Amino acid sequence: MQNFTVSNAAKVLDVSEAQVGRLLSRGEILGSKWGRSWVIDAASVHRYASTRPERGRPYLPERAWAELLDSNVRTMDDAKKLAVLCRRRAVRHGVRVIPGFLDALRKDSRVVLSGVDAGRKFKAMVTLGPPVDLYVHVDDVEKVFKRYVSEDHVTDPNVIIRVVESDVLQQFEHHVPLIVALVDLVAEGDYRSAKEVLNAMK
């Protein structure tokens, strides 16, 4: 697995090293601390690069959710643009959960499932597989992490936890709508599953 230094990541993304530090702290790129230096997962840098805006800023969380839930996506290009604009609707954590706990995590009433789990719920022709993608409200995140998460900010997560501060999750019954699952799959680079979710939306 290829790794970057902070300097490498800054050059790839054409940002300052301080901005790389902020991306690490928000979980938008992944890395591990070795002494006083960071070892950054190159795949997460490239994933971030593929979904960041070329100009302007992504929407703030409240507007991001409003735009996302009111959107009318017809193509994968539309989905990619929406994923860019709405990327800050939640704080992303790539974590490791012991495989034997995954079923319990999926059934936990404090989580709202996204990705392929939501796709399957709404009849998209997707295959269940890692990573599990889900949302958790900020008020519940500490308890969810304590119960299930063995390691946070890992380079090979089997669960993506997206932490939300607003009350938007209250309107969903344990699974996000297909449009949210779609942009999450696009953001993770799972274009094959994303295309199946898009087909199910038509």
What are these regions (language model features)?
Residues 48, 67-70, 85, 89, ...:
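Residues that form generic nucleotide/phosphate-binding pockets
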Residues 45-78:
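A short, Lys/Arg-enriched interface patch at domain edges and termini
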Residues 95-202:
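Phosphate-handling catalytic interfaces
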Residues 3-4, 26, 30-52:
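Short helix-start
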Residues 71-93:
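Long, leucine/valine-rich, helix-dominated scaffolding and oligomerization segments
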Residues 20, 29, 40, 134, ...:
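Hydrophobic beta-strand residues in large extracellular and virion-surface proteins
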Residues 1-23:
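Polyanion-binding surface elements
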